[in-house]
Amino acid sequence: MVHSKTKTSFYRRIYVTWLIQQGVNTVPKIIEATDMPRRTAQDTLAAIHELEIDLENNNGSYRVRDWGAVNANWVNKNINQIKAVLEYP
């Protein structure tokens, strides 16, 4: 199934935020977990704030301070669907 760029962009941002919450909190760890290109990982991290998600960056190690406009419980319940849409492991 083909998904819109809007949907995949949104899912990618919340998935990376979820990964950070799970301890996959550096660009190399995100790349290893997802196989996404480095630039995609960096661009995703740079765009997460557009969802009002508050990340702290401490020398390349990220931490979620606030999920903002995103319901973290919904993400936790639907993480397998999110990964399937993005075709990530």
Segments predicted by a language model, with ranges:
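Long, low-complexity, charge-rich intrinsically disordered regions
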Residues: 1-5, 19, 66-89
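The alpha-helix within a helix-turn-helix
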Residues: 30-32
